Curated annotation (Swiss-Prot):
This is Homoserine O-acetyltransferase. The keyword Transferase applies. InterPro entries: AB_hydrolase_1, AB_hydrolase_fold, HAT_MetX-like. Residues 248-274 are annotated as: Disordered. It comes from Saccharomyces pastorianus. The gene is MET2. It comes from the Eukaryota. The lineage of its organism: Eukaryota, Fungi, Dikarya, Ascomycota, Saccharomycotina. Residues 66-436 form the AB hydrolase-1 domain. HAMAP family: MetX_acyltransf (MF_00296).
Length: 486
């Protein structure tokens, strides 16, 4: 599809109608959803009349070039005010009195854009596991259509972290410096590493292993919550560091309030030693209630015995060494600690996540990440792709990031000619790009003052709309749950 300075206005969809089939839209306030007529995906699949969600702040100037495109991370939404709120506001990095700020929701996300929750017109049901593979480049091309419909002539700066950084890199590589003037990429990579691909696979396998997954054809109200929760816990560990968790949690027990946040199930007091052991063993198991499990211990034990063949009898002389018994009174048992604050935190995060995300969407977006490679279908040598990026670029890395390592940021800065590299010294790992607000704000403001001088020096426009949250407020969509608030 060709692009013009002013493309045909896109049809705006009624969000209330879409909410009937996608209740997760209730979590995003103030966004708009438009219908894109057509897009041919990289795979060759043709999309017709599909939705893209976005949210804006500020006003487009007369030249239609004061545009900041903010790209969200893996499970984020178009609501920048929620997950990067401390950067949004007058005289901040994302200043709506100077810039027209827009964040477009990536395809595969459950928050408004084309996703497994979208209704397939041909079947009248959700796409579910039949949702087509959408790449980072597909996102950029779909988002460009929306920008054209809004009259955007060029982008002053594209900014994103993690998956959002992948989109930022593709924006610059796909459209050049005539359209994209500057770039800021945080905690990202030129191509998705084997390490990251492996973590994505482990998280998908968590979902697949849930018996409620049903090949992806599960009812939305009965999605595989145990698998999705486990996937989220696994992901969170990659966003932090060993020292971050040790400093906060150590081996402490969770408080009553923390246990309530984690929705730790109340279990009945065990009446036998076996029930006591079973409750410890299955603590955290989400597929059955602990009380019910304890009540069937004898039955389960009997079923194991009854399936043993006579030749392997538990009473035979050859197997006597493997036979034992457990005795004692429950009141006399004093077990070692088995429930820790770190576990409580992970369970809380898992429970919080399943109430705001969809399992098929999680699978779709992690596969999107796996496709990311700036050199794919361009040239074999990725350094040549990076060397062709002409835009002034700010690369921000995190010294303790174990997912998108600092060496990967150094690689970007080494081969992108007009780039500067900044390091965030933080013990918080990958999530620091969503936590170190003051430093990130300072770095971006300084970069924009240098490279978007005309816009930054222009008289600010009056902007009385909503702005971001301060850093003490809890984010709904952010990758980071401020661990210090736990």
């Amino acid at each position: 599809m060709s692009h013009t300075a002013k493309s045909k206005t896109l049809q705006e969809l009624d969000i209330e109608d879409i909410k009937e089939t996608n209740p997760l839209l209730n979590l995003v306030q103030g966004q708009r959803i438009v219908q894109v007529p057509e897009l041919v995906l990289e795979s060759g699949v043709v999309l017709n009349n599909f939705p893209i969600a976005y949210k804006t702040w500020g006003t487009l100037n007369e030249a239609c070039d004061n545009v900041l495109v903010i790209c969200h991370a893996l499970t984020g939404s178009a609501d920048v005010a929620d997950w990067w709120g401390p950067l949004l506001g007058n005289d901040l990095a994302f200043d709506p009195s100077r810039f027209f700020i827009i964040c477009l929701n990536s395809m595969g996300s459950p928050y408004g854009s084309f996703s497994p929750l979208t209704i397939n017109e041909q079947t009248g049901t959700r796409y579910g596991p039949e949702f087509p593979l959408c790449t980072v480049r597909d996102d950029v091309r779909a988002h460009r259509i929306v920008l054209d419909s809004l009259g955007v002539k060029s982008i002053a700066c594209v900014i994103g972290g993690s998956m959002g950084g992948m989109l930022s890199l593709e924006w610059t590589a796909m459209y050049g410096n005539e359209y994209v003037k500057n770039m800021v990429a945080l905690a990202t990579s030129a191509r998705h590493s084997a390490w990251c691909i492996s973590w994505s696979e482990a998280q998908r396998q968590s979902i697949y292993s849930d018996p409620n997954y049903l090949d992806g054809y599960y009812p939305v109200e009965e999605q595989p919550v145990a698998g999705l929760s486990a996937a989220r816990m696994s992901a969170l560990l990659t966003y932090r560091t060993r020292n971050s968790f040790e400093n906060k949690f150590s081996r402490r027990s969770p408080s009553i309030a923390q246990q309530q946040k984690a929705q730790k199930a109340e279990v009945r007091k065990p009446s036998t030693v076996s029930e006591h052991s079973l409750q410890i063993h299955n603590d955290g198991y989400k597929c059955k209630a602990n009380g019910a499990i304890a009540g069937i211990s004898g039955q389960k034990r009997q079923s194991v015995v009854s399936t043993t063949s006579s030749s392997d009898s538990l009473t035979s002389q050859s197997s006597m060494t493997s036979v034992s018994s457990v005795t004692g009174e429950v009141k006399d048992i004093k077990p070692a600690q088995t429930y820790f604050s770190a576990q409580s935190y992970l369970r809380y995060q898992g429970t919080k996540f399943i109430n705001r995300f969809d399992a098929n969407c999680y699978i779709a977006i992690t596969r999107k990440l796996d496709t990311h490679d700036l050199a794919r279908d361009r040239v074999e040598d990725i350094t040549k792709v990076l060397s062709a990026i002409e835009q002034p670029s700010l690369i921000i890395g995190i010294q303790s990031d174990g997912l998108f390592t600092y060496s990967e940021q150094e690689f970007l800065a080494e081969y992108i000619p007009n780039s500067q590299l900044e390091k965030i010294e933080s013990p918080e790992g990958h999530d620091a790009f969503l936590l170190e607000f003051k430093l990130i704000n300072k770095l971006i403001v300084n970069f924009l003052k240098t490279n978007c001088k005309n816009i930054m020096d222009a008289k600010p426009r009056t902007w009385g709309g909503d702005v971001g949250n301060d850093e003490t407020k809890t984010s709904v969509f952010g990758e980071a749950e401020e661990v210090t608030n736990w």
